[in-house]
Amino acid sequence: MGFMFLAESFDEWAKPKVKNGYNRFFATDAEKDVVNLVHATRNHPSIVMWSSGNEVPDQWGAEGVKRAKWLQEIFHREDPTRPVTVGMDQVKATMESGFGAIMDIPGLNYRLPLYDEAFKKFP
């Protein structure tokens, strides 16, 4: 039996979900944490892709797009062989901001009625 794994890094970036969350460390530690994750797991045969976040509040607006690009570039620099995704629960917002379009593989969580529209916007 084989398993395929998506190695996920963060539950929040710069915008907080909770008062004492990772957002307090994002600016100083995110790059180091991505590098450590990739270096620790990149040679495992079950890792098929990377995720730079799950339902992060940064999905809204231009700053979130910049952060998504920055994180994806770090993953690509450290491992150019695997794609990067983000689990996006704000599908409409990611279509409008361009957030989803920059992902190697857009990760759509929920919002099933928007999938056809998202498929057209996220080639």
Predicted feature locations:
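Active-site mouth of glycoside hydrolases
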Residues: 1-116, 123
